[in-house]
Amino acid sequence: MRPEQTARLEELSATLTSIEKVMDPEAVSERVRELEAQAGDPSLWDDPDHAQKVTSELSAQQAKLRKLNSLRGRIEDLPVMSELAEEEGDEASQELVETELKELGAAIESLEVTTMLSGEYDEREAVINIRSGAGGVDAADWAEMLMRMYTRWAEKNGHKVDVYDISYAEEAGIKSATFVVHGEYMYGQLSVEQGAHRLVRISPFDNQGRRQTSFAEVEVLPVVEQTDSIEVPDSEVRVDVYRSSGPGGQSVNTTDSAVRLTHIPTGIVVTCQNEKSQIQNKASAMRVLQAKLLERKRQEERAELDALGAGGNASWGNQMRSYVLHPYQMVKDLRTNYEVGDPSKVLDGDIDGFLESGIRWRMAQQEA
């Protein structure tokens, strides 16, 4: 290997060693064995909520172990790859070594960022709400594109997504959607996505082919656990049931299984229609309502701190990213200035760079 490549590889190896000390692969392996034993117990699914937590954590811990082992293996393999490239003596083989070194560096830096997540709720699963904003049918289409972006990111990273509710727009796209991304540290990673996302493109819905600017709002909440003490008395909740609907307002169910919960004291409304039964829809809607009430409580606490001069700006995420498809192609985070010149990759779920830069930016804001 060239001297600069050797130095870079040693640097990456040292970084990975530091990460391994934090993540503790032996402890992760032990936890995987414990969870596998629980998952193999036939009685596990007697409690579906607990079973979901066990299988989600097992998947996350296995993925964590695979990633650590893969990165360590790639570090060990790179000198061998370089030696073979030198024996080949062609430029293409040397370029492969350089490419692998760059990709390895990016992967290790990405993993390093997750070790920075130490907030009170960072390790939780995430509830994501997407709402179309200004821009008419284009905004509804944009909201659906954002939903696909996040679900594609989750799929690529091995995280299960449960869609709780989708409100379809009349012509195209969605008015709103609520879904949960399962897995450890999903809230910590995805919370930097909260705010207004702006799309600029030639509208496919405009007969004159004019450029259109559309907005959609992304809200990210931590999944509420029993330890959070977010109690919602039945007397404070109005429950309405109705038939699930699909695109164009078509009914997709013959029974009133969809559920709408209205929290009377705050006016917060939550709907869920994608579960199989009214009971399941009510339980899922209640989880989202609790998450919204927890976030409301946190916002009130932040507002009190702001009034005392001890807090930051609670609306930091607004107008946070622009996606420009015309007259040029660029996705840019307006907080971090991180940008990518290939919107198609970003919209297909390649958002790791934005998440990492957002997490680093947030840490810098908290330390300032």
UniProtKB/Swiss-Prot annotation:
<comment type="similarity">
    <text>Belongs to the prokaryotic/mitochondrial release factor family.</text>
</comment>
<feature type="modified residue" description="N5-methylglutamine">
    <location>
        <position position="250"/>
    </location>
</feature>
<keyword id="KW-0963">Cytoplasm</keyword>
<dbReference type="InterPro" id="IPR005139">
    <property type="entry name" value="PCRF"/>
</dbReference>
<dbReference type="InterPro" id="IPR000352">
    <property type="entry name" value="Pep_chain_release_fac_I"/>
</dbReference>
<dbReference type="GO" id="GO:0016149">
    <property type="term" value="F:translation release factor activity, codon specific"/>
</dbReference>
<comment type="function">
    <text>Peptide chain release factor 2 directs the termination of translation in response to the peptide chain termination codons UGA and UAA.</text>
</comment>
<keyword id="KW-0488">Methylation</keyword>
<dbReference type="Pfam" id="PF03462">
    <property type="entry name" value="PCRF"/>
</dbReference>
<dbReference type="InterPro" id="IPR004374">
    <property type="entry name" value="PrfB"/>
</dbReference>
<feature type="region of interest" description="Disordered">
    <location>
        <begin position="36"/>
        <end position="56"/>
    </location>
</feature>
<protein>
    <recommendedName>
        <fullName>Peptide chain release factor 2</fullName>
    </recommendedName>
</protein>
<keyword id="KW-0648">Protein biosynthesis</keyword>
<dbReference type="Pfam" id="PF00472">
    <property type="entry name" value="RF-1"/>
</dbReference>
<dbReference type="GO" id="GO:0005737">
    <property type="term" value="C:cytoplasm"/>
</dbReference>
<dbReference type="InterPro" id="IPR045853">
    <property type="entry name" value="Pep_chain_release_fac_I_sf"/>
</dbReference>
